From Swiss-Prot:
UniProt cross-references to HAMAP family, sorted A to Z: OMPdecase_type2
CDD domains documented for this protein: OMP_decarboxylase_like
The name this protein goes by in its record: Orotidine 5'-phosphate decarboxylase
Similarity comment text for this entry: Belongs to the OMP decarboxylase family. Type 2 subfamily.
Enzyme Commission no: 4.1.1.23
Keywords (A to Z) from UniProt: Decarboxylase, Lyase, Pyrimidine biosynthesis
Keyword Lyase: yes
Gene transcribed to yield this protein: pyrF
Family annotation (InterPro entries): Aldolase_TIM, OMPdecase_AS, OMPdecase_type-2, OMPdeCOase_dom, RibuloseP-bd_barrel
GO MF terms held by the record: orotidine-5'-phosphate decarboxylase activity
Reaction catalysis annotation: orotidine 5'-phosphate + H(+) = UMP + CO2
Pfam families recorded: OMPdecase
Catalytic residues as annotated in Swiss-Prot or TrEMBL: 95 (proton donor)
């Protein structure tokens, strides 16, 4: 099954557009995990199990694992998700961008080692830096477009010769040329709802959006759904990380994470209907 088909199935089966971001910070873990050598895996595994009923996908951020030499724990986590929650796609957030031969190895890392269903990439080096990921025809390639950070405007809002901003040029390039196999998506932040709406208008319904910026970054759920949903009321993975992961650091942290995920899913669905 292709990434897009798997995602469409998850949207329908879970009735959710919520993507749970997995950005583990051991300094914020509950006390019961202190000193455990596989604490990152245990924390993320239990978050996954608590939130899976309310999610359409999971997004582990590779730097949070690599910084703690926990790549093996990330690998184990991806194996757990695929085994216990096989209907939910894994989007590996790595934002890779390099020349073809290096990209080939990044693709193998994401799609062979971690068995991710999709990967975030940077478009800055052009098509030949993205083609090694597109060669994996059943996997998703999620391209940075209009990111949620304020500094994104330094480049992404620059005007092209035809007057359109760079982020819209990227959106059009991906939708019209790079997405020939129907495997591309775009990263567009919830913190810029006007730009989110412009991207959706430019790309139509077929290209899914990964939308960070809800919760701690200040993105508004109502504005996000209204701007970014496709004509079927879907088409988005609305990511939340910290608001779910650290809903509680007490003994109820698993339950609190599940309740936070359910609340976000329901808040998103209230706008869809």
């Amino acid at each position: 099954m292709t990434f897009l088909k798997k995602l469409e199935h998850a949207w329908s089966a879970s009735q959710s557009l919520l993507q749970v971001g997995l950005d583990p910070d051991p300094k914020r873990f509950p006390r019961e995990l202190e000193g455990k050598p596989d604490a990152i895996f245990q924390f993320c595994r239990d978050i996954v199990d608590a939130t899976a009923p309310y999610a359409c996908s999971f997004k582990p951020q590779i730097a949070y694992f690599a910084a703690h030499r926990a790549e093996d724990q990330l690998e184990a986590l991806c194996q757990h998700i695929r085994a216990q929650h096989p209907d939910l796609p894994i989007v590996l957030d790595a934002k890779r961008g390099d020349i073809g031969s290096t990209a080939e190895n990044y693709a193998r890392e994401a799609f062979e080692r971690y068995q991710a269903h999709a990967l975030t990439v940077s478009p800055y080096m052009g098509l030949d830096s993205v083609e090694p990921y597109l060669a994996w025809g059943d996997r998703g390639v999620i391209v940075l477009c209009r990111t949620s950070n304020p500094g994104g405007s330094d480049l992404q809002f620059l005007k092209m010769a035809d007057g359109q901003p760079l982020y819209l040029h990227v959106a059009g390039l991906v939708a019209d040329k790079w997405n020939a196999n129907g495997q591309c998506g775009l990263v567009v932040g919830a913190t810029f709802p006007n730009e989110l709406a412009a991207v959706r208008q430019r790309i139509g319904d077929a290209v899914p959006l990964l939308v960070p910026g809800i919760g701690a970054q200040g993105g508004d759920i109502n504005a996000t759904v209204q701007a970014g949903a496709n004509s079927a009321g879907a088409g988005m993975m609305i990511n939340s990380s910290r608001a779910i992961l650290y809903a509680s650091t007490g003994e109820d942290w698993r339950q609190a994470a599940g309740e936070a995920a359910r609340g976000l899913r329901d808040a998103i669905n209230a706008v869809r209907t």
